[in-house]
Amino acid sequence: MTSIDKQKERLEKLARWKQKKSESKAVLNTQNVNTNSQSSNQNNVSDIENKLEKVKAWKKRKLEVKSDQQTPPATQSEINHTSSVRLEENIQGIKRKKRQKRVSNVFDEVKPINSTPTNDAQLSESDILEKVDLNTEDPLDSFFGNIETTEEFHFEVIDNKVNNDELLDEDNSKFDALQKEQKKLAKAKKNKNKKLLTPVNFRNIDLDPISKCLYNEPEEIKSYTEDEIADLRLDLDNIKIEGKDCPRPVTKWSQLGIPYDIIRFIKDVFSYKSLTPIQTQTIPAIMSGRDVIGISKTGSGKTISYLLPMIRHVKAQKKLRNGETGPIAVIFAPTRELAVQINEEVQKLISDLDISSICCTGGSDLKKQIDKLKTGVEIAIATPGRFIDLLSLNGGNLVSTLRISFVVMDEADRLFDFGFEPQIASVLRTVRPDRQCVLFSATFPSKVSNFASRFLDSPLQITVNAEGMVNERINQKFTICSDESDKFKELLSLLKVFNSETVDEKTIIFVSSQQICDIIEKRLTDYSEKLYSIHAGRPYNERRQNLELFKKTSNSILLCTEVMSRGLNVPEVSRVILYNSAKTFAQYVHSTGRTARGTREGTSISLLLPNELSSAYILNKAMRDKDFSECPVKEVKNLKQMAQKFEDGLKSGKYKLSTGLGGKGLENMDNSKETSNNDLDEQLKHQDNISISQEADLPDDFKFDTSVETVTNADGTIATVCKFVVNDLPQLVRWEMTKNTSISNMIRETGCSITLRGRYYPPSNVTNDNNTEPKLYLLIEATDDKAVRHCVDLLKDNARVGFMKATSESLRNTKY
């Protein structure tokens, strides 16, 4: 029975006793009026005597205190003895008072023996009290007995505080000691709920070797220079690396050595048409066997970043023997909801593999989890508390950690915020020391950093963060123009403002090609006498001379191509205008970096067209809040809408963000830019009567000669076959499509068989004789129709690269 129930019972009894008391008093009042009056007088006299005794006792205590002050100081032992004696006296006095009070209450509520008049009716209260059996235990006495200790403690403290300072100090010390003891017990009870495991000494344990390095860098990635890799990481949302010997990032799923059916599954089921920035760098690093710390915002594809390497790691290890429960890989999640979500993703990836997984979370059926663990599982997704519960069952003999060689901590910052650090550390102390640990987090607080330094072996810290890629002293601006004519007018208005300034503030205008540079120079000559232009098509002496004049002339203007942005270092440049908006993050950073050199400040202005979605995406990523606050609200809204449209296209595979590697014209985002350049050429050609040839994508009336059919092989299997005729394509296009590196990359990415067949016929020597060998073509074969079609798309992309190269070659041969 709880204290609340006892209190309720006490109140009910009190109510019944009060009722009986009132009845008994009524009877006594009618029969013994005289006796009551005498008894009342006696009570008044006794009350007065009690008060006098209290006054005498108070005076006596006061005299004792004064005498104590006059006597010499006592020793500590005497003080302690005196305090204990007085404390005992106070306790005994309080007990006597409480006993008297309880007896008085009993007397007040005693039921008369007879309700009718008797010879003993004239009894006094003292006589009645003598007849009461005080040895009988009363329920009310029992209740007071239960709470007596607490009440005595409180009365004791109050009495000591009023009467004796020494007793108060001693009592406070006892109270503080009691509080400390209670806190200690509460802490011990709390720690009791946190189960920790005993560390394992692996020195005397013979462990099976594990395979961790499962990645071979493709030749395509090896061919990149260090500067190109730096630009690539900059394009990929400004990836930052801390650590030594980090593998280079990849740009395609096929470069990871993953089978095509897995690649297609990832693209179709997980909707990752291309790798996200965090995936491009962390997957090669984890597959190389390194401990990795991945820091990226939520929703950036971190789950796939560790699931793919984890599954490959599990497949590379020895299978579980009979009687081994596993697991080989463990994923820790902070919440059961996240653990269930991760398990669903794992189930999708291992559906066709000989791998099993289990989700171990609190609140779920423990018996089912135990039964499944007994059969053996390779992957465990768990919350730390439940996993330790499983490891502690049956004296720690149910689940063994000896086979664990891959550990993942997802959302590590939340894991540690929830207080799971001791549990995870306890588990890791039971796992083999040569394990591979992967840690992913949206933030990287100090407690996560300290944990990583203790349990991870020379980790690579990979941070994806687009913020901060542009110099903080650069004020970034933009203008969205309706068409090319409007953009040129905007350029003129900007230059007009700049020319009116008296301070030497130079301006650089970046354009996308040599042809546009020449056209803009011709049109701007009438507006400024301080205009100089340089590009790679000009003789070296002319470029050097124009650059020197630009440096010496105040308020001068330099017109150049994007390629020249790296080699320019003019401290006086205070403004940069991107007439043709940047195609890549690296290009934007290098172009805007020509201003705000040293400790100076500068401004960058980007001129965009409504169809340049990729440029809007780059600007939206690179600009800071303070930059947006200085731009018109309507312009900012339009820019964000364009950026969101491009981001949606990235997820659906409609668009691809250029990385500046692999040639131009491959990405869908570049088509709009090439179209806008053609529009500019057409307008300027009519206005200035200038004949120019602009780079094009593909001829408008051009069509590829392809045919796809389904055939049945001799063994009964059905295959898809495609003939891609390359005979009639320009020479540079054929070379680009059929060179060994292109063919090997496509075979690795699609899994198709690609062979070159037929013979080459010049355009003037084509025969229709069926007996002759067919025209030169590529034969593409695969059992999967989608793989064949994907291979055809890659061939068309290579053809576009070839057309771009052919056009550029023609321009170089005919311009001068």
Swiss-Prot record:
Compositionally biased intervals (Basic and acidic residues): 1-24
Group of enzyme by EC: hydrolase
Binding positions (ATP): S296, K297, T298, G299, S300, G301, K302, T303
Keywords, alphabetical: ATP-binding, Helicase, Hydrolase, mRNA processing, mRNA splicing, Nucleotide-binding, Nucleus
A biological process term (GO) from this entry: mRNA branch site recognition
Keyword Hydrolase: yes
Name of the protein in its database record: Pre-mRNA-processing ATP-dependent RNA helicase PRP5
Source organism of the structure: Candida glabrata (strain ATCC 2001 / BCRC 20586 / JCM 3761 / NBRC 0622 / NRRL Y-65 / CBS 138)
